[in-house]
Amino acid sequence: MDSMTALRGRIAVALVFLVMSVIARPEHAGAGVEYFPIPAVSTSKNDGNDAGLIVPILKTDPDGELKYILAPMLIHNSIVGMRGAINLFRYEPGGREMRLIVSAAEKIERKVVFSYTDPAFSQGRYSLNFSASFFKNATARFFGLGEGTSVSEESNYTAREGRANWRFGVHVNEVTQISVGQRFRQVSLQQGATDLPFTGTQFSTVDGVQGETLIFGNRATFHYDTRNNLVSPTDGMAVTAYAEVNQNIRNGDHPVYSRYEVEVKKLFPSESKRAILIVRADLQATIGDQVPFFEQSSLGGQNNLRGYGVDRFIDKNLIAWSIEERIHLVRTKIAGTTADFEMAPFLDTGQVFNSFNDVAFKDYRMTPGIGFRGIVRPNVVGRVDYGYSREGGAVFAGLDFPY
């Protein structure tokens, strides 16, 4: 799990257990504040084992709509020791959302993450999104480039990163948006927190491993979306395509490279919408020389090939497919707000490759699995997914659906 999704994952676990723990509570409505101390126990293929306490505090408005989640937590991690964090999520009408995460661990790790999104800015004519973060992720992994990397090549590093980006979109009509944006990314690799070999030593000649990398990117995006909700949809289709030109400021020989992606998601609900089949296809391509490894396409993690750890396979290009059946189990009340609980068996497959000439059916990896979700519509989705692969199993927790 990468540094910014790790903390969100603990919140997600808490939300899922929240849904499970209040099924027997009587319903009530109206504005209010409630808190739920919950044991936080989780495991991750890259991040180790966690045990501690998280206290989600939920605030609702007079209509029972969720407005805030404040979630302080204290966790002991098997790799980085004690970790304290404050997580704040604010939800407003029209899909506006603000997230702030601040965290520090006993060993190496530090995180500050802020994001704001408004999908209906200026009375719905535009969309606006910006975010900034600084973090040190001490459990990052690198196995080398390509589809054929071995578990025996696993290495560890601390990713010291600063990121900032903005995106401004124009709604051409009710279902079509065109947006432009820019991003800045600063990355340097430092000694990791595990006993694995240091990436800087084991892969010293791979682009992006040595020294500091500064990336400045410009992106144009086309987005077609007929889904009935951006965060917790039950019907519709979404197509996203982007082209991005980047400059690697520290690279004087080959500073410019480009990235492209086309992603298609389609939901097939049953008549009652108690079961929803979701199909996703994703194609990514990177063009250029000496592209840093962390800027290339990757498989593994909480959003694709969920039976492997984050960034298990990395190369210039990627093809991925996923299918998931979201099955409604129960509906209950949390702090006067309606919450749903569902399970989701899934199958992920895909491959990375250096050239499209290298694509071969035998190189597709497959990871079956099952997920559990707690949903406070329309803004909050907490999930825990387990995927199985030839290298064992992996557990991922996060906010929002994987696709």
Please give the residue ranges for each predicted region.
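Short glycine-rich beta-strand segments
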Residues: 133-137, 242-248, 284-286, 345-352
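C-terminal outer-membrane beta-barrel translocator/porin domains of Gram-negative envelope proteins
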Residues: 72, 201-211, 215-341
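Short loop/turn motifs that connect adjacent beta-strands in outer-membrane beta-barrel proteins
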Residues: 27-34, 60-67, 93-97, 121-127, ...
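Membrane-embedded beta-strand positions of outer-membrane beta-barrel proteins
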Residues: 37-39, 70-74, 100-102, 128-132, ...
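Gram-negative/organellar outer-membrane beta-barrel architecture
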Residues: 30-37, 42-214, 314, 381-382, ...
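Bacterial N-terminal signal peptides that target proteins for export
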Residues: 1-13
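Bacterial N-terminal signal peptides
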Residues: 12-21
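C-terminal hydrophobic structural anchor segments
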Residues: 326-365
